Design a protein with these regions (language model features):
Chain A
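N-terminal and secondary-structure boundary signal
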Residues: 2-312
Length: 312, 519
């Protein structure tokens, strides 16, 4: 008999091993079909190409946006500064994201931000209004009479806060957060190094009220906020990175061109990659550790499945 | 008669047209500032402003060169400006109809007052004081429109929409209607002014005088009317009466300017504003308006020598009266002037309180406010920056672009971004990190200078609850701070801010600060 002989016991053990392995590791990794990483990091290339590639590596935009969806694209439009100074999100990234949303079948894409300087100035000089409109999105100024008070039942410090109505679940299907990686003195670090602004901080753009009060106890407040309002996809713009004098900046000397796009659905993992890109250890940022501790995502990058790629 | 009815319709059309243009131009004074016509067109057409400001500031102000058009028009047609163009005059006509006030064309005993006002202003201008900010009719309407009428109107519109935003079924279509207009036609943020009531009261007072008789202001108080009367009292185009007049007195009774002499034949061309009402009301059709040889004008100015001298003395007397009122240092130190403003005395001498700068500022940073007595009676309604109500946008120099009189010098954006309006101070009793020993840094976050003017010290601190923590304590770097006030505006404390701006270190146009700083 040329057949290999397996006993009944060997068969049962082997089958059980495969079954347990499948459950533990996930079928994709075991059988090598369509691996969808948690985070993709694309370096080099144009901002638009890098953004597109980052989404392709994550399985494409239709992995996140379904046909007929109403999508909120939330870039950072906080400041009345020129394109390239790293205070606002790169308009090319915003435009590419909107284009991909429509390719995935989105019915409507809305773009807005609660700005720090005068809204029209910010929308215009950031280049985002023009870019988003050219891609077919609706660009709106947020209206002070359209905020709803939202409760945060698991909030440690933040119990209730006004949030922009259009960004609330029920009024939209998906929310795509596009922060710009930059220096910001507010988020505390364990090491005492200057803080960094990323996806969590960018969520403040859909808050209303006296937002300055969020600053006292920022680390707890922002995590409390994201226990209820979470982005479905976060895309970090690390193309022009403001190293000093953030979050507003204004000097080209403070900007470093890193030409990097980081994308993923795990808000904590994406921010952690952003922090790493800035040159810090992820758990140095206190709000990230806090978010990780409360189960909003994964801070340990060794356990986050990441695909990195460099475009030429 | 029918002939003049057509002309009267044309006159009313002209009045409505210029009133609308006035408001459209004023509304156009907003970010991003554009449009083919200067928004201060009416002020530039005002010869009273041009002449008296030039005298008071000892400079020929060419920005008022357009007012020559009005002077030439007046030399030919008399005070046609007052009857056909002046938006304040039109406002009175509308108010008169609503209030049913009567012409009382025979009440003429107070009409010389306006020459006293003009002479007083002239004498004061020679002594380098301009009182135009109180008396000029176009400035008056500009100020009332900016400070009261437009904010009132926008509030009404915005509130109506805001109500619909909370009604489930119609909220989305209502917002869809509203949002394309927001920031384009409807201001994004509601203009709010601390002292708008004082502006309104002044305006209501003048309107109330209309109850005495029509066009009271124009007949008896308006210095621009007086000046145009001087230019136009021998105008060739005039009212003439044919010999078939039966002296029914209707024209004289119904003259809203009281310009018809009691012989019904002669007209006071220093007062006639060519409204044409007399030609229409005349049952005999004997009144017409035409170019005619110069007729004798009845005592056009009603000014005796005693009144001349009295007016001049009043002009001299009022200047020290106003100039010797001052406010406390504390109030005026919190009253920052717009960037590019002339040194204070020159500034007050040039600023006519038209509120063009306030209007344009309300569409962007929103810090400029008409003051009341913060800078003295002398500075009433002059623009001051209230940094708790708004702040000076780092990328904006629009106020300097709209100033019609040059009280705010036209400065470039680069100049503005390094020119100090004042400086920021931390109130360490109120500022959150000093008071609660908690991080805050909203001011540092917003500080717009490329290298931050607000920095912070990290110090290990014992908190009220006994724990030890690193706290970021903010401070100001004087050499970088331009006093834009965004820190004061954005401070999350309720009421008084934990950081505030004063005029210390300010750099007015043509004047650099001498204060040396070390940091």
């Amino acid at each position: 008999m040329a057949y290999p002989i397996i006993t009944r016991r060997e068969f049962v053990t082997g089958a059980a091993t495969v079954a347990v392995g499948t459950v533990l590791l996930g079928p994709n990794r075991l059988f090598g079909t369509v691996p969808v990483p948690d985070v993709s990091v694309v370096r080099g290339g144009s901002a638009a190409a890098a953004t597109r590639r980052a989404l392709e590596l994550l399985g494409g935009m239709n992995h996140y946006v379904a046909s007929g969806d109403t999508v909120i694209v939330k870039p950072n439009i906080g400041w009345d500064t020129r394109v390239g100074l790293g205070a606002d999100t790169n308009p090319e990234v915003v435009k590419e994201v909107i284009t991909m949303c429509f390719e995935a079948g989105a019915k409507k894409v809305k773009v807005f931000d609660n700005t720090c300087n005068e809204p029209r100035r910010c929308y215009q000089s950031s280049g985002i209004e023009a870019a988003a409109k050219s891609a077919g999105a609706e660009v709106e100024f947020m209206n002070e009479n359209r905020y709803d008070q939202i409760d945060f039942p698991n909030g440690v410090r933040l119990k209730s806060w006004p949030v922009y109505r259009d960004a609330l679940p029920g009024n939209r299907d998906k929310i795509i957060n596009i922060p710009v990686l930059k220096h910001h003195s507010l988020p505390k670090t364990k090491s005492g190094k200057p803080g960094i602004s990323l996806g969590f901080k960018n969520m403040m753009g859909i808050m209303g009220g006296n937002r300055g009060q969020i600053h006292n106890g920022f680390e707890e407040n922002i995590v409390d906020f994201c226990t209820v309002i979470r982005a479905d996809l976060t895309i970090v713009d690390a193309t022009n990175v403001l190293r000093r004098n953030g979050p507003r900046g204004g000097r080209l000397a403070d900007v470093e061109k890193l030409d990097t796009i980081i994308a993923g659905a795990d808000m904590v993992a994406v921010d952690a990659w952003g922090v790493k890109t800035f040159g810090y250890e992820p758990d140095d940022l206190i709000y990230l550790s806090e978010a990780n501790r409360r189960g909003l995502g994964h801070i340990d990058l060794s356990r986050v499945v990441t695909v990195e790629e460099r475009l030429s | 008669m029918a002939h003049f009815q057509r002309w009267k319709n044309l006159r009313i059309g002209s009045q409505v047209f210029f009133l609308v243009v006035f408001f459209v131009l004023l509304w156009q004074a907003r970010y991003p500032l554009g449009g083919p016509f200067p928004m201060d067109l009416f002020l530039r057409l005002d010869p009273l402003l041009g002449i008296l400001l030039s005298i008071a500031s000892r400079v020929v102000l060419l920005s008022f060169a357009l007012s020559l058009i009005i002077i030439v028009l007046t030399l030919i047609f008399g005070r046609a400006f007052c009857g056909w163009i002046c938006p304040l005059g039109t406002t009175f006509d509308v108010a008169d109809h609503l209030m049913k006030s009567r012409a009382h064309g025979t009440r003429i005993r107070t009409r010389w007052w306006k020459y006293v006002v003009l002479i007083g202003l002239m004498v004061a201008a020679i002594l380098s004081y301009q009182g135009l900010w109180f008396f000029d009719p176009l400035v008056l309407l500009d100020r009332t429109a900016t400070g009261v009428i437009l904010p009132w109107f926008w509030f009404l519109i915005k509130e109506l929409f805001a109500t619909t935003f909370n009604i489930p079924v119609i909220q989305n279509p209502a917002f869809g209607l509203y949002n394309p207009l927001a920031g384009v036609i409807i201001p994004l943020s509601q203009p709010l002014f601390l002292h708008s009531m004082s502006i309104l009261l002044f305006f209501v007072g003048i309107l109330a005088l209309e109850k005495l008789h029509r066009r009271f202001w124009c007949r008896s108080l308006c210095p621009l009317g007086a000046l145009l009367g001087v230019f136009g009292h021998r105008a060739p185009f005039q009212r003439t009466v044919k010999s078939d007049c039966n002296e029914c007195a209707l024209c004289r009774e119904n003259c809203k300017m009281g310009a018809i002499h009691k012989d019904y034949d002669r007209t006071n061309r220093a007062d006639c504003i060519l409204c044409l009402n007399c030609a229409i009301i005349c049952p005999q059709d004997s009144i017409t308006f035409e170019f005619a040889s110069l007729k004798h004008s009845p005592a056009a100015f009603d000014l005796t020598r005693r009144r001349w001298i009295g007016a001049a003395v009043a002009g001299v007397a009022v200047v020290p009266l106003i100039k010797t009122t001052r406010t406390t240092n504390q109030l005026s130190s919190r009253s920052l002037r717009p960037p590019g403003a002339l040194p204070e005395d020159l500034f007050l001498n040039r600023c006519v309180r038209c509120q063009e700068c306030v209007q344009v500022c309300s569409s962007t940073g929103g810090c400029l406010q008409p003051s009341l007595l913060e800078t003295g009676w002398d500075g009433c309604w002059s623009p001051i920056a209230n940094m708790r109500m708004g702040y000076c946008e780092y990328q904006c120099n629009l106020c300097s672009k709209v100033c019609p009189s040059g009280a705010i010098h036209k400065i470039t954006l680069e100049d503005k971004q390094s020119r100090k309006m004042g400086r920021a101070f931390f109130d360490r009793n109120r500022c959150i990190p000093y008071d609660r020993m908690e991080d805050c840094l909203v001011c540092e976050e917003h500080c717009p200078t490329p290298e931050k003017a607000i920095l912070f010290d990290v110090r290990e601190t014992r908190r009220p609850d006994g724990t030890i923590a690193d706290v970021k304590f903010p401070y100001v770097r004087l050499d970088r701070c331009i006093g834009c006030g965004i820190c004061e505006y954005i401070c999350p404390l309720p009421g008084e801010s934990g950081v505030y701006c004063t005029r210390e270190n300010e750099e007015r146009w043509g004047q650099k600060t001498n204060i040396a700083f070390t940091s």
